[in-house]
Structures are given as structure tokens and as C-alpha cells.
């Protein structure tokens, strides 16, 4: 199975299981320049060719205002995919690091970026926003909520923002980190290095490392956590009987 067919097997299943895409949708795809969002864009662009429900996609980047960031290669990538591309210039980095000097900036940054993305999606006449969170992200988010907030919770596979009249979808839900890496190794894309000084210095990075250690000593633990989320119907997750094989890659 080639890399695109493999990826689409996960994406199509998630989209169908949660009815993420409907006839006539105009979907904004949030593009950070990282491998996850670019992989999602490539998958949704390819799936337009054969998915029975016709839809349009618009790629949207929220430029945080860091110096020296060039989106021209991403723009060319979108042109090749025949996808409209919008870059929204903001001062988020300046506000967080220079004005407010936030000691723990990640939460505020995410909130501001989400607000800008949702506003631009509305401006582009989109009714849905697709985000690049995948299988491992779901497990990590669930565990972070358990460890640091003492609650059972995660982002939802599909959710509706009534104040924005936007539906958020996560089509990479069944694709693992290894699946995304497998795709990127075989399908060159303009993956960018994050200019954020807090990159890799977060609680999420710590949780990623903890889960990797648990997986090493307890094979399949992430798969079982994901399964438990579905059995418990945590935040809209549901049991369908078909999940990824814990990131198993056939080289």
C-alpha cells in the first residue's frame, strides 16, 4: 500500500465514523507549517477526487509575527494541490512574549491562534474547520487532563461552535504519529521548523516522553487508552471496533 492510500484509509474511516464531511462543505484547514497540518491538507485535497460528498477546502495560516518566517513554499504547495491559501498576519508573538511576558505562554497563544483561525474561516465563508490533531495527540490530551486537571476529558472528534457557527473536525484521529512520519518520509512537503522559543519545552512534550516510556514497557498501552476513551464515550469519542494498529508500520 502506498503512503497516500495508507493515510486515506485512516482519514476516510474517521470522516465516515463521525460524519465529519457533508455535501457542499467549505472546510478551512488550519496550517501551522508542521507535518501534521500539511499531511492533513494533502489527504483532504486528494480525497476530494473520489469522496461521494463534494466539498471545498481553504488552507489558512495564522502568522504569529515571528521574524524571518517565509510561507512561500507552503503557498506553492497549496498551489500544486489546487487549494486556496490565506495567510493572516498577527502580533500574537509580540503580545505574548514582549508585552505580557507570559511565563506560561502556551495556553494564551493557543487561544489567540484559535480565535484568529475561526475568524478567518468565517471570512472565507467556511462552515467547518479541520485541525491536524491525530491519534497520539488524543491520548496525550486525555492523559494531561487526567494528570494535571483531575478530570476525564479530551478534544472532541467533531464539535460545533455555536457562537461562530463553525464545526470543528479532526480527520487524522485514527492516524498515529508514526503514520504521519511514514507519510512525510515518502511524500516531500515544505515542513517548517517552529520559530516559537517554547517549542519542545512544554507539558505536552513531557507527556509524549512519558507515554513513549510506558509503551516501551507495556506494548499497546496507548491503544488501550484510546480504546478506553471510546468505550467511555469521552467527549464524543465512540467505539466503532476499528482502530489503528498502535502505529505499526510495514516498511
Regions found by a protein language model. Name each.
Residues 189-251:
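The feature marks non-catalytic terminal segments
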Residues 9, 13, 17, 76, ...:
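Charged/polar, solvent-exposed surface patches and flexible loops
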Amino acid at each position: 500500500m502506498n503512503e497516500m492510500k495508507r493515510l486515506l484509509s485512516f482519514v476516510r474511516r474517521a470522516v465516515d465514523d463521525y460524519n465529519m464531511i457533508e455535501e457542499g462543505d467549505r472546510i478551512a484547514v488550519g496550517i501551522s507549517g508542521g507535518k501534521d497540518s500539511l499531511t492533513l491538507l494533502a489527504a483532504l485535497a486528494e480525497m476530494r477526487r473520489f469522496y461521494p460528498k463534494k466539498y471545498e477546502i481553504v488552507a489558512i495560516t495564522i502568522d504569529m509575527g515571528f521574524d524571518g518566517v517565509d510561507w512561500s513554499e507552503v503557498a506553492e504547495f497549496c498551489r500544486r494541490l489546487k487549494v486556496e491559501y490565506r495567510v493572516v498576519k498577527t502580533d500574537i508573538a509580540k503580545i505574548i512574549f514582549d508585552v505580557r511576558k507570559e511565563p506560561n505562554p502556551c495556553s494564551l497563544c493557543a487561544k489567540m491562534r484559535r480565535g484568529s483561525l475561526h475568524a478567518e474561516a468565517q471570512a472565507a465563508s467556511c462552515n467547518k474547520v479541520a485541525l491536524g490533531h491525530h491519534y497520539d495527540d488524543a491520548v496525550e490530551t486525555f492523559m494531561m487532563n487526567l494528570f494535571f486537571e483531575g478530570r476525564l476529558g479530551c478534544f472532541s472528534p467533531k464539535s460545533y461552535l455555536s457562537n461562530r457557527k463553525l464545526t470543528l473536525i479532526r480527520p487524522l484521529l485514527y492516524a498515529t504519529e508514526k503514520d504521519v512520519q511514514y507519510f512525510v518520509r515518502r511524500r516531500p512537503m515544505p515542513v517548517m521548523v517552529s520559530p516559537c522559543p517554547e517549542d519542545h519545552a512544554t507539558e505536552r512534550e513531557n507527556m509524549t516522553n512519558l507515554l513513549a516510556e510506558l509503551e516501551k514497557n507495556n506494548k499497546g498501552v496507548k491503544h488501550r487508552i484510546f480504546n478506553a476513551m471510546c468505550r467511555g464515550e469521552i467527549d464524543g469519542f465512540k467505539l466503532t471496533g476499528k482502530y489503528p494498529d498502535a502505529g505499526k508500520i510495514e516498511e
